[in-house]
Amino acid sequence: MAAMHTAGAADASAIAAKSISGEADSTALIAAEEQIPTWRQRDYTDVPIGTPYKYGDQVYKLWQAHDATNQPDWTPDKAVSLWDICHTTDPAKAKPYVAPQGTRGMYQIGDVCTEGGIIYRSTIDNNVWQPSAYPQGWKEMTDENI
C-alpha cells in the first residue's frame, strides 16, 4: 500500500511539473486526471502557478497563489479568479460545458465539451457560448467524425 501511495505521489509530481513548465497542455492533464490530486481546503501560497488539481469532474490549474485554509467557498468552480479550468481536444474525455469566466476558460478551436449528452467541438477560438446558444461556433461530434 505504501509503495502504491509513493508511486501515485511521484506520478502526481511528474504531471504537475509538466503542467508548470508548459510541457503538458490541458488535454494532457485531463488524459492524466487519475494522477492529479483532488483540491482540498488548504494554503496554496507556496504552490507553483499552473499546478493542476481535480475538483468534481473537472481539472483546474492554479492561477493565483492564495490561502484557502479558512475559505471553504474558494473552490476552483467558485473562486474563478484563483483557478483556470482545463478543456480537452479528446472527445473520449469531453467534460460538460462550463461557462468561461472573463478571458480564462474560453474554448479554443478543437476543444470539446458535452451538452445534453452530445459531444461538441469548438470551431472558433475564444468561444464563450454553450453549443445550444451559439451552434455556429460548435460542430456536433458523431461516430463518423470523432
Features from the language model and the residues they span:
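Tryptophan-rich substrate-binding surfaces of secreted polymer-degrading and adhesive proteins
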Residues: 1-146
